[in-house]
Regions:
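A contiguous active-site-proximal alpha/beta segment in oxidoreductase catalytic domains
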Residues: 74, 84-165
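Viral RNA-dependent RNA polymerase
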Residues: 1-4, 9-12, 20-22, 32-34, ...
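Glycine-centered short loops/turns at secondary-structure junctions
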Residues: 113, 329-330
Length: 353
């Protein structure tokens, strides 16, 4: 598998595309169309890898960076339509800051018959412990812990949660409503039972990076019981997601409590929650990215996405609506447009070796 052409949208000081092209023998073109045609008159590549990240791009009122992922994608689609042939596209991370644009991207893949894959590396990295929810399991509630800023780290956490709960009985049905709250209201919502303290405890138990007392002297701790979590997390956020089939799930962004991403769920008739950590291997290796690259290679070789782009579509839209909730005063928003239905793959596709 070879890189044969490249388009670079921005070239700040230190940008290495020309050096890499010289080293590895590919060409850099001034437009996406020319890159896809390798300077010729028709589509001349077997697949497209689109990375809309980094760079100097504007931010909207929801604090979303307006990366041109949709625009890159549509430039590719234009070439496919003009040349009468389409090839698979991988789109790094969320499809777009806009659900409307993201849906058009997925629809283009179905319309023209090419594979579309997108998303985070978290769903395909290792899990500690190795947990795969049974397909068609009955989930009563789900909870995810994430860290980092919004947007994009809440996106990564939300997609990790989605890859677990999409395996529930009946498949994915879409999202009926969302609400995002911040600060002390998050803890009050937990006390009131809006999200499960039991699931938070189960998720925290999988973290390898508890902060506070563990950082200070290595002791183990019950962060909820001793109250340490309330001291450590200065500005928690809770993303409440209500699904069309009645399932409720919560993403808690808890900067200061832990440094990793952990999930817990209550399954019907189970006496204790199931929980796991989405393992992020340390720098400089960051081998969880290699797990995602393996799935990209599978898409490119077979033309078939190993898991549906509808997962990323739903997460893209859910996150957008959550950020709209925050912007509009943390109100609950009904989301009839997020009626995205799909089935999870039989195997979860995460790394096991």
């Amino acid at each position: 598998m070879k890189v044969v052409s490249l388009f670079v949208d921005q070239k700040p000081e230190g940008e290495q595309s020309i050096d890499r092209a010289r080293e590895f023998g590919f060409s850099v073109y001034p437009t996406i169309a020319e890159a896809l045609r390798c300077g010729g008159d028709e589509l001349a590549v077997d697949a497209v890898l689109s990375i809309g990240e980094h760079g100097d791009y504007p931010t909207n009122e929801k604090s979303q960076v307006l990366y041109p992922r949709y625009e890159f994608f549509k430039e590719c689609v234009k070439v496919f339509e003009e040349d009468g042939r389409a090839v698979p596209i991988f789109n790094d991370k969320h499809l777009s800051y806009s659900f409307e644009k993201a849906k058009e991207m997925v629809d283009d893949g179905h319309r023209l018959g090419f594979g579309v894959l997108a998303g985070s590396s978290l769903p395909v990295t290792w899990r500690l412990p190795d947990v795969e929810l049974p397909l068609e399991c009955e989930i009563e509630e789900g909870l995810m812990i994430g860290v980092g800023g919004s947007d994009p780290m809440d996106y990564h956490a939300m997609e990790a949660m989605q890859c677990m709960i999409e395996r529930r009985k009946g498949g994915e049905t879409g999202v009926a409503a969302v609400q995002l709250i911040d600060g002390e209201e998050v803890w009050k919502a937990g006390e009131d039972g809006r999200w499960s303290l039991e699931l938070l405890e189960a998720a925290l138990s999988r973290s390898d990076t508890p902060c506070g007392l563990t950082d200070e002297d290595g002791r183990t701790q019950d962060m909820i019981g001793n109250g340490e979590i309330y001291r450590l997390v200065e500005n928690p956020s809770a993303y409440f997601i209500e699904y069309n089939d009645g399932l409720r799930a919560t993403l808690l962004m808890l900067n200061g409590a832990v440094r990793d991403y952990c999930f817990a769920a209550k399954l019907k008739d189970a006496s204790v929650p199931v929980s796991t950590q989405f393992f992020l291997t340390p720098t400089p290796n960051v081998t969880y990215s290699a797990c995602l690259i393996a799935k990209i290679e599978e898409l490119f070789e077979t033309g078939i996405a190993p898991y549906p782009a509808e997962r990323t579509l739903l997460v893209s839209g859910t996150l957008e609506s959550c950020l709209t909730s925050r912007l509009q005063g943390h109100i609950r928003l009904e989301t009839p447009h997020l009626d995205v239905e799909y089935r999870a793959p039989a195997e979860s596709q995460y790394a096991r070796q």
